[in-house]
Amino acid sequence: MLLAHPGGPYYVRKDDGVWTVPKGELEGDEDPLAAAVREFTEEMGSPPPAGELVALGEARQRSGKINLVWAVEGDFDVTGVRSNTFPMEWPPRSGRTVQVEEIDRAEWFDLATARVKIRKAQLPFLDRLAEGLDGSG
């Protein structure tokens, strides 16, 4: 399972429970699958591997946002990850703005390790992926 570690000062010393599937937000009336491919490309620095995209459904984050996720079997070299950036006030309440990478690294994990690393709200995606790999889903 390919997961991304969030960039920025809040996540420098955090590991378990903060990794995420590459994700983002829809722009206007953008098709959700097109948005997923665009966001993956922006966050990872290159497009997802070619192949059949399999829907893993949706899950709600603590913020209330809903993530729609697709899986694809393929190779992706994490050593070449180059994320886009966003402005963040840092230190907090300082009035200074710094550019922060959305993700600072990506790694491949087996499903058992991914369950420890991924945000709890995204665990349903791992369950659905495992069901599909077992042939029972």
Residue ranges, per PLM feature:
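N-terminal strand-loop-strand
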Residues: 1-21, 70
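Residues that flank catalytic or metal-binding motifs in active/ligand-binding sites
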Residues: 15-17, 66, 102
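Charged phosphate-binding loop/patch that engages nucleotide di/tri-phosphates or the phosphate backbone
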Residues: 107, 111-137
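Residues that scaffold the ATP/ADP-binding catalytic core of kinase and kinase-like folds
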Residues: 13, 29, 117
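Active-site-adjacent beta-strand/loop module that shapes the phosphate/pyrophosphate-binding cleft
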Residues: 58-95, 107, 129-130
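Non-DNA-binding regulatory cores of transcription-related proteins
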Residues: 98-104
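Short loop segments at secondary-structure junctions
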Residues: 6-8, 73-77, 111-113
